[in-house]
Amino acid sequence: PYDREKIWRHLNEMQRGNRATLTDRVIGVIDLALWDLAGRALKLPVHKLLGGFRAKVPAYASTMCGDELEGGLNSPQAYADFALKCRERGYKAFKIHTRMPPIPGTPSPKEDVAICAAVREAVGPDMALMLDCFHWYSREEAYYIGKALEKLNYAWLEEPMDEHNMASYVWLTENLTIPILGPESAEGQLFTRAEWIRQGASDLSRAGVMDVGGITPVMKIAHLCEANGVRLELHSPGAGNLQCLMAMGIPGEYYERGLLHPFLDYEEPSPWLNTLDDPMDDEGYVHVSDRPGLGQDINWGYIKENATGH
């Protein structure tokens, strides 16, 4: 576990002829395991191995995509009501994933703007709000949404267009004042992030341990962003991303906590864990564990009972 860089480079090179099976997600799982093993062997949490910078970080409530369920996220008012519920829980920021296919009539720029407006009206001016469009829109549609969000004082617009078309993101970033966040799903690990920064394709960068191949490349991206004065927001919850956030010198502003929905109790840990990876206090801060490795309190009994092989 102490040769993580060597192993990551080897896997990255092997990926060139095996991309269909040796995906970034597979490499990410291996890299996470190596960091966890190293921390456990040295009796240190991973964020301390990475350098250590903070012990807590503010979280944003990240919703599930909208639905057609009674009592779910089925209307602008439903999103507004849920935002108020999240604010009562302690969240200082709220990110919207709007409705998308196969729901009839979606994706819809006008519906997205209506949802965003309803949420802003409900929570007032002080709660940070964001929108994730999940790459559904054209340049014109993304521009329309972005201009509306500027008037609503949203913190960022995330992944509104297909990320394979970097030129469209350069155009959008140049023509809007709201910060554009990306790339999230574009292939290319740290190399794609470097090119987006060079070309000015977004204002804020984006990566996650399961998107780019683990903690090792995420920290490379963090240092790349630091050198260029660009904030890095990490994608998705989880112990790996949380450990990285606690070690980033120029931090991402938030930890993504979710995905949240009116029907779900996020405060209940997954059955393979005894406690949450990301406990949040009443002020909206997520605290990192000082347990060795990734800091997870694993329910080994559950894992043994549900193992499918050896």
Residue ranges and their predicted role:
Residues K56-V57, A61-V170, N175-L176:
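Metal-dependent enolase-superfamily TIM-barrel catalytic cores that perform enediolate-based chemistry
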Residues I27, G105-S108, L131-H135, E158-M161, ...:
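Glycine- and other small-residue-rich loops at beta-strand/loop junctions that grip anionic moieties
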Residues D290-H310:
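Extended hydrophobic packing segments that form well-structured cores
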Residues I30, K43, F94, D132, ...:
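Conserved, mostly hydrophobic/aromatic
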Residues D31-G66, E70:
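Glycine-rich, aromatic-flanked loop segments that form ligand/cofactor-binding clefts
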Residues A41-L44, L49, Q77-A78, G90, ...:
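Ligand-binding pocket scaffold of soluble enzyme catalytic domains
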Residues K6, G17, N153, H164-Y285:
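Shared catalytic-loop signature of beta/alpha-barrel
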Residues P1-L42:
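Metal- or metallocofactor-binding catalytic centers and their adjacent structured scaffolds
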